[in-house]
């Protein structure tokens, strides 16, 4: 074989053929169309060697099997027919693997996703390592697609239809023990013996067909299948609001295969894959994937990062506890927490304990691994143990004098190279650094709550922050498993600045008489994961509205919230979910009582709660203000590119991913249409909808935020 081949065949002395997968020059193995010739040549050799007792497919990469198909192949397709042909080519290769007369085993270590799992499904048996890096899944739905190389047909027959639907409709990834439990793999072994165990499995021969659990057998029958698909279709529709066509096609294709046979199923799969590849939703989701991949590679600045072995955290509250957890347990860094009392330290330690104990209970990690990770975290009520910290993150109250005091204390008690990162959500970083002896080592690092779940962080340098400080902070964020965007030190930074007008408009709709649940439902239908009123309840009404006066002082009336409404709600001791009452009422913690709108909220703000506007009208008002503010942020260089703006909105506030982010969405609409809608709304509802100068200029020139092949509009 050519040395540049991604697939290499070696026949062992025991007459088992080992096919090593190693895409040249790439960290991850991905399947490309041009590999078809290589694979076919190897399969031909296998068929011609009558002495072979079995075949093992294994990766030569240290931490992945096959991470999926190369998504660029789909982008290169100019029509649904081309994408369908691509799927049929993949199906044919998998069919040839399955048709081999000798037993074929997939030996899996690391990520086995998408086309990688489809290849493993085409093998007769599967074995994987018990390593934390090993995950198996079909995540195509997250790109607006479905598995196109036979996955929709083979998976239901292997693990049962309900398990397969759950995996394919959500894109969820199974850990080794889960994969074994559902029958996706035959064995789970230590990494050190993977190859030998796979060879042994190949020599044993093909296993008898696994008996599915009784429940799965019932659901595979005509009556059970009809009921299952009806129920899943209804549930999926409620979740996607019809915004993701891939989910409907997945259900249709799997049901076709089960009802009419796999041949019809493969045809339906390839056809649906081709059609979905051309949808705007898939294109937008793939753009988000590429943009997030680019952001994760972006070092933040041209400088080399400084040392980063240990981190300090000031404050053991909710944010401090979450930051300590992701730094130690995801980043693997030593963490020292300082709080004014032992209660705060214990709270932060318990936060990590609870997170890790949940993982132990779910058998994601062992107790020994939990203890090892917890050992990275310690605490103190003074600065003992801080002298060698490379970076200190403060997560104390939003009080400028207090944060300036923290800077002074860190400079006094830590090393000269220690970086001070503030988790402020509203205070200017330049003000926090105003009295610093080393202002070049002060930076903002804005996390979102809950820290362990929210993927985005904003990295905020002020005017004199050094390039090395930026690079080191970005490196830390990546270690914590976050997606960092670098934003300017202006009031509200980026995410809160575009979120505030959206929330304010929702409150205005409420004061005009619209119902809470109708406003939330309108924005969920538009594509947000939760509505704006519910979001305010989840964040905490006191916390979520704290930034409004800051933004109003910086940018004027367009950021003013409806007079007295917020004050009335806060004065009535309504903080949202955290104290059980906000716009909604919440049941006792631990009980499964649903949240309900509190009718008293209408009396409190002096309205009747009767809907007048359509869902589309309500969504338009909230979203157009967000788009207008995003365009201003782009113009003022608050964000470095449209790419960062889209990632910030999708990962930070749940802007509908199928629209690609605010800038992709504005490009889809066209600047002229965005301006026309804003001008119409300004005439109806006031000056806050007046389109910004950037949008007016772009509409006049016919410009876009994303230029072909570029990350943003070039000046």
From Swiss-Prot:
Q: Which reaction does it catalyse?
A: a (3S)-3-hydroxyacyl-CoA = a (2E)-enoyl-CoA + H2O; a 4-saturated-(3S)-3-hydroxyacyl-CoA = a (3E)-enoyl-CoA + H2O; a (3S)-3-hydroxyacyl-CoA + NAD(+) = a 3-oxoacyl-CoA + NADH + H(+); (3S)-3-hydroxybutanoyl-CoA = (3R)-3-hydroxybutanoyl-CoA
Question: A GO molecular function for this record?
Answer: long-chain-3-hydroxyacyl-CoA dehydrogenase activity
Pathway recorded for this protein:
Lipid metabolism; fatty acid beta-oxidation
Record's keyword terms, sorted:
Cytoplasm, Fatty acid metabolism, Isomerase, Lipid degradation, Lipid metabolism, Lyase, Multifunctional enzyme, NAD, Oxidoreductase
- Keyword Lipid metabolism annotated: yes
* Annotated site residues (Important for catalytic activity) in this chain: 118, 140
E.C. no: 4.2.1.17, 5.1.2.3, 1.1.1.35
Q: Where in the cell is it found?
A: Cytoplasm
PROSITE patterns to which the protein is assigned, alphabetical: 3HCDH (PS00067)
Extract the ranges annotated as region (3-hydroxyacyl-CoA dehydrogenase): 306-715
Q: Where is this region: Enoyl-CoA hydratase?
A: 1-190
One Gene Ontology cellular component annotation held by this UniProt entry: cytoplasm
Q: Which Pfam families match?
A: 3HCDH, 3HCDH_N, ECH_1
Q: What is its main location?
A: cytoplasm
Can you tell me where the transmembrane regions are?
none
Q: Which GO terms describe its biological process?
A: fatty acid beta-oxidation
Briefly state the protein's biological role: Catalyzes the formation of a hydroxyacyl-CoA by addition of water on enoyl-CoA. Also exhibits 3-hydroxyacyl-CoA epimerase and 3-hydroxyacyl-CoA dehydrogenase activities.
Q: Which family does it belong to?
A: In the N-terminal section; belongs to the enoyl-CoA hydratase/isomerase family.
Subunit structure comment from the entry: Heterotetramer of two alpha chains (FadJ) and two beta chains (FadI).
Could you identify this protein by its name? Answer: Fatty acid oxidation complex subunit alpha
Q: Which organism is it from?
A: Citrobacter koseri (strain ATCC BAA-895 / CDC 4225-83 / SGSC4696)
User: What does the record give as the organism's lineage?
Assistant: Bacteria, Pseudomonadati, Pseudomonadota, Gammaproteobacteria, Enterobacterales
């Amino acid at each position: 074989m050519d040395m540049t081949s991604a697939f290499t065949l070696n026949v062992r002395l025991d007459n088992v053929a080992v096919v090593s997968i190693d895409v040249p020059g790439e960290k991850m193995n991905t399947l490309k169309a041009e590999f078809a010739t290589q694979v076919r040549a190897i399969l031909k050799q296998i068929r011609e060697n009558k002495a072979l007792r079995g075949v093992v497919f294994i990766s030569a990469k240290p931490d992945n099997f096959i991470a999926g198909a190369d998504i660029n192949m789909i982008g290169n397709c100019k029509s649904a027919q081309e994408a369908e042909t691509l799927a049929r080519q993949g199906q044919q290769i998998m069919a040839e693997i399955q048709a081999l007369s000798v037993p074929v085993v997939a030996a899996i270590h690391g990520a086995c996703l998408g086309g990688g799992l489809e290849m493993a499904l085409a093998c007769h048996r599967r074995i994987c390592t018990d390593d934390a890096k090993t995950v198996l899944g079909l995540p195509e739905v997250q790109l607006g697609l479905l598995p196109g190389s036979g996955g929709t047909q083979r998976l239901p027959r292997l693990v049962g239809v309900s398990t397969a639907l759950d995996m394919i409709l959500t894109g969820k990834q199974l850990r080794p023990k889960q994969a074994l439990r559902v029958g996706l793999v035959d064995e789970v072994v230590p990494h050190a013996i993977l190859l030998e165990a796979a060879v042994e499995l190949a020599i044993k021969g093909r296993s008898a067909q696994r008996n599915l659990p009784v429940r799965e057998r019932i659901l595979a029958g005509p009556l059970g299948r009809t009921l299952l698909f009806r129920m899943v279709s209804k549930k999926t529709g409620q979740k996607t609001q019809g915004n993701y066509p891939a989910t409907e096609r997945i259900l249709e294709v799997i049901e076709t295969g089960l009802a009419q046979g796999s041949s019809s199923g493969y045809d339906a799969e390839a056809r649906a894959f081709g059609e979905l590849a051309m949808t705007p939703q898939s294109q937008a989701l793939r753009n988000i994937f590429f943009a997030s991949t680019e952001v994760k590679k972006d070092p933040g600045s041209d400088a080399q990062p400084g040392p980063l072995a240990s981190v300090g955290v000031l404050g053991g509250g909710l944010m401090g506890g979450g930051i300590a957890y992701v730094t130690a347990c995801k980043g693997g860094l030593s963490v020292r927490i300082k709080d004014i009392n032992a209660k705060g330290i214990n709270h932060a330690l318990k936060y990590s304990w609870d997170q890790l104990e949940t993982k132990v209970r779910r058998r994601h990690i062992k107790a020994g691994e939990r203890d090892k990770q917890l050992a990275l975290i310690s605490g103190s009520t003074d600065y003992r143990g801080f002298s060698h910290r490379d970076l200190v993150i403060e997560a104390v109250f939003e009080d400028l004098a207090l944060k300036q005091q923290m800077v002074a204390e860190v400079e006094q008690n830590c090393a000269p190279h220690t970086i001070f990162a503030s988790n402020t959500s509203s205070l200017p970083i330049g003000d926090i650094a105003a009295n610093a002896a080393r202002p070049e080592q002060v930076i903002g690092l804005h996390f979102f709550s809950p820290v362990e779940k929210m993927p985005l962080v904003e990295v905020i340098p002020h005017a004199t922050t050094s390039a090395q400080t930026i690079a080191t902070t970005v490196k830390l964020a990546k270690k914590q498993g976050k997606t960092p965007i670098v934003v300017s030190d202006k009031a509200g930074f980026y995410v809160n600045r575009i979120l505030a007008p959206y929330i304010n408009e929702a409150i205005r709709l409420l004061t005009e008489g619209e119902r809470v649940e109708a406003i939330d439902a309108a924005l969920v239908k538009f594509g947000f994961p939760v509505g704006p009123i519910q979001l305010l309840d989840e964040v905490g009404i006191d916390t979520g509205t704290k930034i409004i006066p800051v933004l109003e002082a910086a940018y004027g009336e367009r950021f003013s919230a409806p007079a007295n409404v917020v004050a009335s709600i806060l004065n009535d001791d309504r903080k949202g979910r955290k104290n059980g009452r906000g716009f909604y009422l919440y049941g006792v913690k631990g009980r499964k009582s649903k949240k309900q709108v509190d009718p008293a909220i209408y009396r409190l703000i002096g309205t009747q709660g009767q809907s007048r506007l359509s869902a589309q009208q309500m969504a338009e008002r909230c979203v157009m203000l967000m788009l207008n503010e995003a365009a201003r942020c782009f113009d003022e260089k608050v964000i470095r590119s449209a790419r960062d703006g889209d990632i910030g909105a999708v990962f930070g506030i749940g802007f509908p991913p199928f629209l690609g982010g605010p800038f992709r969405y504005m490009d889809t609409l066209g600047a002229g249409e965005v301006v026309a809608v804003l001008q119409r709304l300004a005439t109806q509802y006031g000056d806050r909808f007046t389109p910004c100068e950037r949008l007016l200029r772009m509409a006049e020139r016919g410009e876009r935020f994303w230029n072909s092949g570029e990350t943003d509009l070039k000046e």
